[in-house]
Amino acid sequence: LYPLYVTYSIFRSRCAACCEEELDDAKLQQLWDAAVRENVFVICKTPMAKQITRRTLAGYRDIPVNAHYFDDLINMMKNKTRQFVDRVLKPSYWKQEGVKAMKFDAVVGNPPYQSMTNGGSDSGRAARQAAPIFNYFVEQAKMLEPGYVSMIIPARWYNGGIGLNAFRADMLNDKHLTKLVDFANSKDCFTTVDIGGGLCYFLWERDHEDECLVINMNSGEQDALRRSLNQYGNLFIRSNKAISIIEKIRAKADSFVDEMVSAIDTFGIPSKVRGHEEYTEGDILLVHSDGANSSKTSYISRDVVTKNAHLIDKYKVRISILVPQNGEAGVKPEKGYRSMSTPHLVYPGQVDSFSYLNIGFFDNETEAENFRKYMMCKLPRFMMRTTYSSAHISQSNFIFVPKMDYTRSWTDSELYEYFGLSDEEIKLVESTMRPMTDS
């Protein structure tokens, strides 16, 4: 339907340029055919898509329709980019006689989002995983050097990840990206489509450089803010309303929790290490993963610890190195996010494996427990969520989580008051995050 919508828009513009008395049926047909012939050029992924495009624009009439398909479109875009661009820019490819070079005013579309690829073996069967491909369409569209590019694509590029890190960096630093309309819930855009992480569409303008107008769409309401997409480096803050919260916290806080968080693999113990069940004098307790949301303990010698031995006898607070539910990409926003697994205390004489990230170290249990409870509050987890770029958690995800006084306990209400959050900002945090309990 995109070719039809574009053609109709051009057709209406042609009609507007004519006197109303001229617009009889013959003239209208002439204007429509001219728009199809002169203004619309379609790249299709399959022969069927090409045939549907022809029928949509011309019906059963024998008129020229500029529609082509590539036998191996995705491979061409991924591995033969220059060849693809050169072919599309050749007038002969489109059978345009007397034209020296093809120049496209705009490239628009709703490209395919992903393809299934072999990802190794799983119990003797080929493992399948979804690889993003929409990014290739955006990149090739820019290479055609049109005046404008506008496409609707999954919003998961905000977080980077496999196949998207370079694309994200390019998009965030592209000053020609002048408008970004964001749908955290895909059903706010396509009512019958549920896409984890939501959707977005954008406007790229070749001859215009400016900050980007970011528009958050939520249940029919919109919030717009003109800002630099790379305001925080390679971290894209999706919510416009979160910007003011970040700035309030940065203005008030003296330091941030990222200073407390250890590097991944605190003690140099691989996830696969399993200790022994019987305690031997001098042993320490190892906490290791036992599948999703589960852990087990065993005993190991202190010699197994190859890093940070001085932290063994501290009180530690640990979380999983993974964001729950594969990055919570499929979580419906209205149900709320957790941002991290439930934090647990790791006592002196205990260590954990690579599966866990230690986010705080303390000399006494009271401060360790107060910090653990603090991290279960909604505001710290909300601040973590604004930084996510993958399903893995690391030090960098705590750069906006303020360090507090842990000789006392904290509640969200106290945190909201301390940082001076407005009612609207509080509502955003409360509606985004789900409560976290120990159960």
Enumerate the language-model features and the residues they cover.
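Charge-rich, low-complexity amphipathic helices
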Residues: 163-164, 171, 193-194, 393-397, ...
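A structural signal for short hydrophobic/aromatic patches embedded in well-ordered alpha helices
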Residues: 53, 371, 429-430
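Short, amphipathic C-terminal "tail helix"
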Residues: 427-439
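C-terminal substrate-recognition regions of SAM-dependent nucleic acid methyltransferases
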Residues: 102, 186-425
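SAM-dependent methyltransferase catalytic region
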Residues: 1-179, 185-189, 198, 202-214
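Short, surface-exposed acidic
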Residues: 63-68, 423-429
